[in-house]
Amino acid sequence: MISVGIVGGTGYTGVELLRLLLRHPQVTVRVLTSRTEAGKRVADMFPSLRGHTDLEFSDLNEDVLKQCDVVFFATPHGVAMKYAKGLVAAGVKVIDLAADFRLQNLEQFEKWYGLEHECPEILKDSVYGLSELNREKIKTAKVVGNPGCYPTTVQLGLAPLLQADVALIKPENIIIDAKSGVSGAGRKASLGMIYSENADNFKAYGVAGHRHHPEIVEALEHISGQKGVFDQIIFVPHLVPMIRGMLSTIYIDLTEEGANSDLQSLYEIYYANEKFVDVMPANSSPETRSVRGANELRIALYKPQPNKLVILSVQDNLVKGAAGQAVQNMNLMFNLDEDTGLTGIGLLP
């Protein structure tokens, strides 16, 4: 059995991670930490877990974490990098669900997160954890940076086009119009997240610049092998009055080659063997509720004009966009079937 530690167990991603791991046939959750709830039974805070765990929250103790096989950090940015070096030295694998190991560009990390990176040598050897695109590197990784939720929808939405043998799109003209449920903002109380601020309301945020923009740019450069062509991408996220779910609508200008290509077949072939990416029939409309609670991402393509392409990409922001993808990465790191513990079907309605 894989001995697991979770640092940060009271947030939405932390409890979602615990929910998934408690059902995992190869995992024992050894420790679950909280800065504020040490000594409290997990099931008392989250009644949905009653009968499934006797765990109590505990203070973060690095010596205890070093007895685990893998430690997940479901914490704010800046926490995992404080402990990664010591854990790696002790032979413990690390999966960070925050941003400490997403960006290889230290200047961009410090600019967007306002933190000086505490272990750049570990960052250099870490692997970006988008399972479908980096699985071979993830298998041998000691530290994995779990991707951001929005960047996951964008990368999987664009990868078949960017890795084609010929230029199919004009990358400098990409527009990403993304929407997320409010759970993406976390569980910490804040004025902007209360019911009366979000119910019956719909708003954009981070329009002048969002932390996921540099992550998207760096990742697309890696996928395509092209530098400097994605800097002008427009990315605008929105907050919608629902709890879970994320939909990214990606607008693309096609090259002449792209306009004359069978893009539906391109996507179907590219993702044919992927367990967690579903390419829907042409002109379908993927809905967030179809992936609620599941580690799945659904994609649909539209060509409203001969030289235009619209990509729709949906996922549960807490599962494929966070905790589920982290478990998927753990499975790869421990040479398990990638879908172990992740075969749940989306909830409907």
From Swiss-Prot:
Domain of life of the source: Bacteria
Homology family: Belongs to the NAGSA dehydrogenase family. Type 1 subfamily.
Lyase recorded as keyword: no
Enzyme class: oxidoreductase
Subcellular location: Cytoplasm
GO CC list: cytoplasm
Active-site residues, record numbering mapped to chain: C149
Function according to Swiss-Prot or TrEMBL: Catalyzes the NADPH-dependent reduction of N-acetyl-5-glutamyl phosphate to yield N-acetyl-L-glutamate 5-semialdehyde.
Pathway: Amino-acid biosynthesis; L-arginine biosynthesis; N(2)-acetyl-L-ornithine from L-glutamate: step 3/4
Gene: argC
UniProt KW keywords: Amino-acid biosynthesis, Arginine biosynthesis, Cytoplasm, NADP, Oxidoreductase
Name used for this protein in its record: N-acetyl-gamma-glutamyl-phosphate reductase
Molecular function terms from GO: N-acetyl-gamma-glutamyl-phosphate reductase activity; NAD binding; NADP+ binding
BP GO terms, sorted: L-arginine biosynthetic process
